[in-house]
Amino acid sequence: MGEKSKGYVFIAIAGLLWATLGLFGKFLMGNGLASEQVAFTRLFFGFIVLGIYSSIRTPQILKISKKGIIYSVIIGIICQAMFNLCYFKAIDIVGVSIAAVLLYTSPLFLAIFSKVCYKENITRSKLFSLILCFIGAIMAVTGGRLDFQGLNAFGLLLGILSAIAYALMPTISKNALKEFSSSTILVYSFLFGAIFMIPSSKPWEILNYANNLDVLFCMLMLGIVPAALAYIFYATGISKGVELSVAGIVASVELVGSVIIGCTILGESFSLGKLFGVMLMLISAVVALNLSYDEIRIFYKSSKLKQIEKTESI
């Protein structure tokens, strides 16, 4: 297997690791943790693991200026804390598969933000891709039945808000990445996101689960698997020479993984309409192959890891 082929495998693994977000989150919430506490757990343990890994492999990326701290605080609050909070709340209310589908509407909001903030053109090809994504999302959420009465409106709103927070990452951080490594911003945004979550998550209450080894293990895995380890695998794939645009498409396996986990392990509803909707969303990602679609992954899918390519050989 060639180096680039290995890169594709690593990126696909990263996507599947991200897909476990809902699985770990659902287990923890099912054992009594609030969604705020689950969000805090992911950010806190993710920061610890990534911080340790970075200090061993590339300690220079932990150096940060006052300006970098300001960027990290803003991104940590808006794009990390708010994203995780909304996403886990959506998972708790509407389930893993629907929450994942709603999250993947983020390219729609990215296109709007890019147009408003940076005057980027929405070409016909990009518009076609976004329309496919929108139709696919509706099909996947409703199962092909245009009946929204059985759906929880608040849960859907939270899913959409998570997509908005997700799309705000490249919008807010575009200038920051001209001066700082995305890994630097990632580590510290996890830290400040966790700090911001302290008042609402009341992490000291999590100590009540100190005797529950299953919960403690799952909390640690939440910080390792869909957080630190997924980013490390993605960075490894990029370092093998995989094109950034192609990497964004390969990582879309996350959506498929999330739906499969939701429908099989967690027993969520499944229909041909939902399958068709997910397929449309994946097709929209392929259509966007030569567009700027993968900019949405600056942090969560790390498609801007150019600094790692230059400074780190994983």
Residue ranges and their predicted role:
Residues 1-41, 148-175, 195, 300-314:
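Glycine-/small-residue-enriched transmembrane alpha-helix faces in small-molecule transporters
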Residues 5-13, 36-56, 74, 125-135, ...:
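Hydrophobic alpha-helical transmembrane segments of multi-pass integral membrane proteins
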Residues 16-33, 45, 84-94, 102, ...:
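Juxtamembrane C-cap of transmembrane helices in multi-pass membrane transport proteins
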Residues 41, 80, 99-105, 173-194, ...:
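Helix-helix packing/entry segments at the starts of transmembrane helices
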Residues 43, 142-143, 215, 252-314:
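C-terminal-most transmembrane helix of multi-pass membrane proteins
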Residues 49, 54, 106-131, 256-275:
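C-terminal transmembrane-helix exit sites in multi-pass transporters
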Residues 50, 54, 122-144, 197, ...:
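Hydrophobic transmembrane alpha-helices of multi-pass small-molecule transport proteins
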Residues 51-97, 139, 223-241:
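Specific transmembrane alpha-helical segments of multi-pass solute transporters/efflux pumps
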